[in-house]
A protein has these predicted regions:
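N-proximal, solvent-exposed amphipathic alpha-helical segments enriched in charged/polar residues
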Residues: 1-32
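Extreme N-terminal, non-catalytic leader segments
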Residues: 27-30, 35, 47-105, 339, ...
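Conserved catalytic-core segment of NTP-binding enzymes
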Residues: 60, 206, 210-211, 217-318
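Walker A/P-loop phosphate-binding motif and the immediately C-terminal alpha-helix
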Residues: 101-138, 254
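Phosphate-binding loop that captures ATP/GTP phosphates
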Residues: 124-188, 194
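Switch II (G3) loop of P-loop NTPases
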Residues: 155-157, 176-191, 200-224
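Glycine-rich phosphate-binding loops of nucleotide-dependent enzymes
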Residues: 174, 216, 229, 337
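C-terminal boundary of histidine-terminating zinc-finger modules
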Residues: 318-329
Length: 364
């Protein structure tokens, strides 16, 4: 039996593609060490995105492949996760205790943006990340309801300055709804709304988050511009439906984020298909393939396509979104895929950003 060497192990690893980074572990820069002791091989990999529900199966697949090498009787692959801080706007200082800010936005209301934001935050937490969600939809805050936080709940104040977020389902939650009467409408002009958003972002005592998901109000107005100019966003997720009108407004959202140099991580298509609960007939009530066309048009990824489902609505309204209510369901698995893709896209966006040139000034 011939002895195994490092090159042979690396060759095996290069044959397997991480489905979220779209690269093999070595090309993606995930390899940390290869230790060969006779016929035993130990490999250490490190992922830069939350993948708690994925990495054990991934490690087992790679381990079996390495054990297929001649000269190897046993192999062990350990995969750890280290989530780094990323931001698109270099000139904006980072938020205290927040590594990555993800904006969830839509061009128009009624497309399931808030439900997507809630399930994304919960899915990231299930993958092992430390997560918070900020309800920036100041005119129509709904995250308190979706996270099952009782009406009238108020955040504690720390050091007479900081709002302490309310924890629910393992996610830290902050919303303007916690500071106002639920029955009182927010009749505010743009500058007041923008100021309130900044106060919520900068004066909430988040506890060392890997990801802060911001549920944006629909449209392309003052709050979106404030976010781009004042908050260090890592990337945006655009939520739409296949309907032509929704896609038209979603395009405006994509264009807006691009103009302010915030990368669009991808598109989520809600209400893609309705499946009859009685006969199982599938019907595209709002059109077909709209999210895919939008993603293709702008060269971004279709991160998820979700059906029109009464359960998604009922579970969110009941304070336990699908990821919590039915964690093993097919729809919950789509949200987990979404979470892993979002985390991986942030890593890939950072890698694709060109470095600033080194400028040397001399007297020669």
């Amino acid at each position: 039996m011939s002895a195994v060497n490092r090159a042979a192990v690396e060759a095996v690893l290069r044959q397997y593609t991480d489905p979220y980074l779209n690269q093999d572990p070595i090309s993606a820069g995930c390899l940390r060490s290869i230790d060969i002791q006779g016929d035993r091989v130990s490999v250490q990999l490190e992922l830069g995105y939350a993948a708690g529900l994925f990495k054990s199966g991934w490690a087992q697949m790679l381990q079996m492949a390495i054990e297929g090498l001649e000269g190897v009787t046993s192999a062990k692959v350990d995969i750890s996760t280290v989530i780094a801080a990323h931001k698109a706007q270099a000139q904006i200082p980072g938020l205290a205790n927040v590594k990555n800010v993800v904006a969830v936005a839509s061009g128009k209301g009624g497309v399931g943006k808030s439900t997507t934001a809630a399930n994304l935050a919960l899915a990231l937490a299930r993958e092992g990340a430390r997560v918070g969600i900020l309800d920036a939809d100041i005119y129509g805050p709904s995250q308190g309801i979706m996270f099952g936080i009782p009406e009238g709940t108020r955040p504690k104040i720390k050091d007479q300055k900081w709002f302490v977020p309310i924890e629910s389902h393992g996610v830290e939650v902050m919303s303007m709804a916690f500071l106002t009467d639920d029955n009182t409408p927010m009749v505010w002009r743009g500058p007041m709304v923008s100021g309130a958003l900044l106060q919520l972002v900068t004066q909430t005592a988040w506890s060392d988050l890997d990801y802060l998901v911001i549920d944006m109000p629909p449209g392309t107005g003052d709050i979106q511009l404030t976010l781009a100019q004042k908050v260090p966003v890592a990337g945006a997720v655009i939520v739409t439906t296949p309907q032509d009108l929704a896609l038209l407004d979603a395009r405006k959202g994509v264009e807006m984020f691009r103009k302010v140099n915030i990368p669009v991580l991808g598109v989520v298509e809600n209400m893609a298909v309705h499946i009859c609960s009685n006969c199982g007939h599938a019907e595209h009530l709002f059109g077909e393939g709209g999210g895919e066309k939008l993603a293709s048009q702008y060269g971004v990824e279709l991160l998820a396509s979700l059906p029109l489902s009464m359960l998604i609505r009922e579970q969110a309204d009941g304070g336990k979104p699908t990821v919590i209510a039915e964690p093993d369901s097919q729809i919950a698995m789509v949200y987990q895929e979404l979470a892993r893709h979002v985390g991986a896209r942030i890593v890939l966006q950072e890698a694709a950003t060109p470095a600033m040139p080194n400028i040397t000034v001399s007297d020669d």
